[in-house]
C-alpha cells in the first residue's frame, strides 16, 4: 500500500458475516445482515473479526491457492488489458465465493481479498450451435458434447465430414451389388456395420480355416455382440397387456428380496440414490407382496400397486448391474444373478405411461421416474444416447413433477411453513408417513435432482433446467444425512458456472469462469476432507465429482484453444495447445489407473457400475480431442513426424483400453468403434501422405463434383457446402490462384487460416510431448495375450476382403503403404510439391485410396 492510500483510508475494526461476507462495524454485530434475513439464515448469521487487515497489501490468490493448476490471471488476460485491484469488496464479487461455515475458522484462505480482473471474453460457438434433425428426434447438442466440439474445431469438422462421405460412397458401392444388410432390432446407424459384417462373412472361404482360430473367434465375438445389442433393443421395445402381467412371474420370493436385494441396495446403492425412507419403502413392498404376489390379485393401477411393482423391478435391475460390473466371483449374490431382468425396463415403461405422467404425479411415481433416470445413466443399454442428448426430456419431467409436488428450495429455506393435508387413500398412508417424513424425503429428492441437473451442465455443457439457487449452510453434520445435501453448499458456485457458460456462449468471460472453477475445486476439496461419517461409502461420489470437474476443464481448454486460433493470438494459442495436451495426458493416466490400478483408487467394486459411466464419458472425450492435435502437427516446427507417430500410437493405446474395457458391455461404446477405427486409419499415414492435405483435397474435389452435379450425395441430403461451410470458404480462397498454386497446406496455414504463418521461434514455444507419462499407452501389452477388439476387428477383415474388393481408381496401389497397428517406421520429410489447379478433380475413389487401403470401407471397422 502506498503512503498516499494509507492517509486517505481509515481502517476501523470490522466484523465479517460468515454467510454473505458482509462487513459491519463491531458495534453492529448483534444485528443479523439484511441478506441473511432475506435468505432465512438468521440463525446462522455469525460475525467474525475481519482477518484481512489491510486488504490492499494482502497476498494474491495465486500465492494462497495450492490447487491452482492453470495459468495465472495475469497470463490469461489478453495483451492490452490491465488487471485491477480494489480497495473494498463488493457484494457481487463476494458472491463468487461459497464457503462452508464450519470451515472458515480453520482456513485463512477465505479471508484473503479477491482481486477483480478485467473480463476477457471468448466465443465458444464460432460456427454456431449444432442442431441435428432426423426421423426420430431433433437435438440441440450441448456446448461440450462430441458433436459440438467437432463442429467448433475446423480440423475435426473436416475429418468427420470426410469420414461420413467416404463411408457413404462405399455403402453405395456395396448397395449396388445388393449387399446391404438391415437388422430390424438395431437402428439405421448400424446398417453400415451390419453390411460390412455380412460382406466379410460371404467371402471367408475354407482355405482360411487353418489360419484361423483368430478368424473364428473374431466372427463369433462380432456376431455375439451384434446379437446382444439387438436383443437389448428388442427387449426394451416389448409390449405388454396389463391383464396378462402377473407379478409372481418376475419377482423373487419376499424373503430373498429382503435378504439379498434390499440388503445390497441399502448397504451399497442407496447412498447413490437416497430418495426413499427405507423403513417406509420396506413397508410398501411387504404390503405389495401380501396383497398381490401371495394372493395372486391383479396389479391395481388405481391403488398405485403398479408403481410399487415398478420400483421393485428397478431396484432389482440396478442391484444386478452392481454385481455384474463388479467383476466379483459369480458365487456372490448367486440368486440375484439368476433373476432374469431382461423385460424389466419394458414393464416399467408400460406402467409409467398407463398413468397421467405428463399431467400429474405422486411421490411413488416420482421416485420411479428418478430410479429410471438413474438406470438410464448406469445401464449398458443406450438410455441417454451416445452423447447424453436424450436425458433432458426425462429430467425435465422429473423437475416439473418436483415443482408440482412442492419439492423445491422451500423444503430447506422454509420447512416449517409446509402445511399438509394427507388424505386417507394416499400411498404411503398417513399411518406410516407423517409430515416430518415428507419433509425429510423432499429434502433428499430435491438435493439429488438438483445435483444431477448441475452435473449435466459440467458433462455436456447443456444449460441447467433449475434456474434458482440459494446459499446453504448447515449447523451440524447431522443436518447433512446424504452426500447430495452436503453438496448444496456448492450449488451457488455450480449455478454461477452454468450461467457464465450459457447466458451467452458467444461471449463467455473466461477469467470469471476460471476463477469460479478454482473456487469450486477449493471448496469441494475442503468439504471432502471434512467428511467424518460414511467416508468409506462416499468415495465413489468424490471420485465422480473430481472427474466431472476435470472433464469440464478439458472441454473448456479445447474451446479456449480454438478461440485463440481463430483470433490469431499466437502466444495464447501455443500455451493453450500445450495445456490441453497436458490435460489429455493427465486424464488418460487417470483412466489407465482406473482400469489397471483400481485398488489404489479405493472405489468399492460394487459401485463400479456407477463410476464406469463418468470414466467412459471422459475417455471418449480424449478420443474425440486427440485427432485435433495430430491434424495440427504441421503447424509447429517443434512437432516432427516422429512426434506425430507417437501421438498416433497414443491414440491407438487409449482406443484399445477404451473399447476393450467398455466395448463388450456398453452399447453406446460398441457403436462408436466403427467411426473410431476409421478415424485412426485416416490419421495413421506415412510421412509423405499427410492426412490433413488429403482431407482438404478430397473435400475440395467433392465440392467440385457437387457443383458439376456428379456428387454421390443424395439430393435429399444436405449439400457439403452447407454441412461444412468452412471448406466452401477455403475453396473460394484456392480459386483465387491462377495456373499453378502453392501447396494446399500453405494456402490453408498462411492465407485462409493465418495463424499458421507465425513461427514457433517468435514465441520460443517448444512443445512438450510428455513421453514418460504416455508410456503405458505406447507400450500397449495389456491385450497382447488376448483378443484386442479394437485392432482385431479391423485388421483381419481387411486381409480377408482384399482379393474380393474392386476399387474404382486410376491410381496404382503397388507402392501404397498400408496402415497397420502402430509400429516404428523410417522417418521421412513430408513432400510439398506444387500442383496444377486442373489436377484438383480426380476420380471419385482416388483420394479415398490415397488415405485408405482398397478395402478400408468394406471391413468391419
UniProtKB/Swiss-Prot annotation:
Residues annotated to bind DNA: 19-47
Domain of life: Eukaryota
Pfam families the record matches: Zn_clus
GO cellular component: mitochondrion; nucleus
Disordered: annotated span: 52-99
Protein's cellular compartments: Cytoplasm; Nucleus; Mitochondrion
Chief location bin: cytoplasm
GO molecular function: DNA-binding transcription factor activity, RNA polymerase II-specific; RNA polymerase II cis-regulatory region sequence-specific DNA binding; zinc ion binding
Keywords: Cytoplasm, DNA-binding, Metal-binding, Mitochondrion, Nucleus, Repressor, Transcription, Transcription regulation, Zinc
One GO BP annotation of this record: positive regulation of transcription by RNA polymerase II
Xref: CDD domains: GAL4
Physiological role: Transcriptional inhibitor with a significantly increased number of target genes in response to oleate.
Name the UniProt record assigns to this protein: Oleate activated transcription factor 3
Species: Saccharomyces cerevisiae (strain JAY291)
Gene encoding the protein: OAF3
